[in-house]
């Protein structure tokens, strides 16, 4: 928390003292996350167990980065005077950082706060620092539990940054006043209810509110920009290679697309889809503000094409068994300075998954980049 501007406050106090008038007490600034609804997402590049994972609160009250412990839907949080809240539960942090949500407000930690603003919200701090750690859960080393401290001692624990992305319904770019709506914990039985404005989404689906600049970019990129609200990041990115048709890349963070004569390396993007708003848009935004992008092609410009697919790619998908293409979605060019492309697509059904394939259109066209949330870079699906 910061006090009001010290030079201004000092000047006012001096003037009031000189005039014999009593000064009003100084107040701490209101935390920008106070009484807002927001989702939380972990950031740790290069670690697929923790990078770009939403937060889940299990039946035990512990925080996880994947569905487990009786929950299948990521949590919606709020902040109240330094306390992290899910529904009527409050985060309690013990000496080793174990964090459990409990109904006892008196046991709640009051050390949570918003850090620096980002493109999609704020960094979440505990005790003024980014001290969070994600460790393999004791009963499942494929699922990581979040601690605000030392962790559980597992050698595979990883430090994480935490991004809080605020629901558009509880914040406004033109007003800093806090919303009065209360946070709700979204259960699997209530997935279809979003009237509260809470951000609800399914397994590994990362939902980030659209910023004003991102919206303007999308509109400039496509005259047919839809009214879709949230960009979803892919939870699966898989490379398929015609020269090695049985080779499995696994899940990657850096899509690669190129064509060399008859050899193709294509990328399949898979998205988990929450409740659909009624219109959907596929959007690609790349520039030089994030991780480096690599583009090759005629006169430095690569040409690429997108397809929608008949089924969803999975961990066993390779070039030889890739899903069939339904139709071409569109084509776009990209250079070393980046590219913007947006097009309306047929909406998938709510609470399903959908895959799209990106391919080079011309010989020697090459594109590689890194999907990231801050700054917003890569291919996203808006629903």
UniProtKB/Swiss-Prot annotation:
Major site of localization recorded for this protein: cytoplasm
InterPro entries (alphabetical): Ubiquitin3-bd_protein_But2_C
Keyword Nucleus carried by entry: yes
Key words, A-Z: Cytoplasm, Nucleus, Signal
GO cellular component, one term: nucleus
Signal peptide from the UniProt entry: 1-23
Places the protein is found: Cytoplasm; Nucleus
Domain of life: Eukaryota
Homology family: Belongs to the but2 family.
PANTHER family assigned: ANCHORED CELL WALL PROTEIN, PUTATIVE (AFU_ORTHOLOGUE AFUA_4G08960)-RELATED
Protein name as catalogued: Uncharacterized but2-like protein C27D7.09c
Record organism: Schizosaccharomyces pombe (strain 972 / ATCC 24843)
């Amino acid at each position: 928390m910061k006090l009001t501007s010290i030079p201004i406050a000092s000047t006012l106090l001096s003037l009031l003292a000189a005039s014999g008038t009593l000064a009003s007490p100084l107040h701490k600034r209101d935390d920008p996350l106070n009484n807002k609804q927001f989702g939380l997402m972990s950031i740790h590049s290069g670690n697929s167990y923790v990078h770009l994972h939403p937060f889940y609160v299990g039946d035990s009250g512990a925080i996880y980065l994947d569905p487990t412990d009786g929950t299948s839907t990521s949590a919606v949080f709020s902040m109240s005077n330094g306390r992290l809240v899910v529904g009527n539960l409050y985060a309690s942090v013990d000496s080793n950082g174990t964090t459990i949500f409990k109904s006892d407000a008196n046991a709640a930690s009051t050390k949570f706060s918003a850090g620096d603003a980002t493109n999609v919200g704020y960094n979440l701090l505990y005790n003024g620092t980014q001290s969070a750690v994600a460790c393999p859960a004791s009963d499942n080393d494929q699922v990581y539990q979040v601690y605000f401290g030392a962790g559980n001692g597992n050698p595979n624990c990883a430090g994480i940054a935490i991004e809080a992305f605020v629901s558009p319904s509880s914040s406004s770019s033109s007003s800093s006043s806090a919303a009065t709506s209360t946070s709700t914990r979204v259960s699997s039985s209530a997935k279809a209810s979003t009237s509260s404005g809470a951000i609800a989404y399914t397994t590994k689906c990362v939902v980030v509110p659209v910023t004003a600049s991102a919206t303007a970019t999308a509109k400039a990129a496509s005259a047919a920009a839809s009214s879709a609200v949230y960009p979803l990041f892919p939870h699966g990115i898989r490379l398929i290679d015609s020269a090695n048709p049985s080779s499995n890349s696994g899940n990657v963070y850096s899509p690669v697309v190129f064509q060399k004569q008859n050899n193709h390396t294509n990328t399949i993007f898979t998205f988990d889809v929450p409740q659909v708003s009624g219109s959907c848009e596929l959007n690609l935004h790349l520039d030089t503000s994030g991780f480096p992008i690599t583009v090759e092609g005629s006169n430095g410009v690569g040409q690429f094409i997108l397809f929608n697919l008949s089924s969803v790619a999975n961990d066993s998908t390779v070039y030889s068994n890739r899903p069939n293409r339904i139709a071409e979605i569109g084509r776009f060019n990209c250079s070393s300075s980046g590219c913007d492309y947006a097009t309306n697509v047929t909406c998938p059904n709510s609470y399903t998954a959908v895959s799209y394939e990106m391919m080079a259109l011309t010989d020697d066209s090459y594109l590689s980049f890194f999907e990231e949330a801050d700054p917003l870079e890569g291919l996203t699906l808006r629903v």
